[in-house]
Amino acid sequence: MSKLEKLVEDLSALTVLEAAELSKMLEEKWGVSAAAPVAVAAAPAAAAAAAAPVEEQTEFTVILVDGGDKKINVIKEVRAITNLGLKEAKDLVEGAPKTVKEGATKDEAAKIKKQLEEAGAKVDIK
């Protein structure tokens, strides 16, 4: 197997979170941005895309922005939500910002956000 084939196999095995982290690491190392360059020729395509109906988002990601002052309560809630062990939940809370739940429905994401905020955390939904 060639180097490139091995690289493709390794990259294909990454999770979405690992791929996003890899992207950020490469941006920092190479001093570039993954944002698409804006071109004048792209303007007509953008106008056509704007005319298309906007689909409502159905899957949400709950992100723990900050563990807050009551980290023990937040760790308990994170464990209840994610079924993580004590150490993993503690690492997640102390390593904020971190993703708590991916692919959640709108209601589920709102419920998780409410639980974590009541425990003292700062939470964002994307």
UniProtKB/Swiss-Prot annotation:
Domain of life: Bacteria
InterPro entries given in the database record: Ribosomal_bL12, Ribosomal_bL12_C, Ribosomal_bL12_C/ClpS-like, Ribosomal_bL12_oligo, Ribosomal_bL12_oligo_N_sf
GO cellular component: cytosolic large ribosomal subunit
GO molecular-function terms, A-Z: mRNA binding; structural constituent of ribosome
GO biological process, one term: translation
Keywords: Ribonucleoprotein, Ribosomal protein
Protein family (similarity comment): Belongs to the bacterial ribosomal protein bL12 family.
PANTHER family noted in UniProt: 39S RIBOSOMAL PROTEIN L12, LARGE RIBOSOMAL SUBUNIT PROTEIN BL12M
HAMAP family: Ribosomal_bL12
Role of this protein: Forms part of the ribosomal stalk which helps the ribosome interact with GTP-bound translation factors. Is thus essential for accurate translation.
NCBIfam families to which the protein is assigned, alphabetical: L12
Description of how the protein assembles with itself and partners: Homodimer. Part of the ribosomal stalk of the 50S ribosomal subunit. Forms a multimeric L10(L12)X complex, where L10 forms an elongated spine to which 2 to 4 L12 dimers bind in a sequential fashion. Binds GTP-bound translation factors.
Protein name from the UniProt record: Large ribosomal subunit protein bL12
Source organism of the structure: Rhodospirillum centenum (strain ATCC 51521 / SW)
Upper taxonomic lineage: Bacteria, Pseudomonadati, Pseudomonadota, Alphaproteobacteria, Rhodospirillales
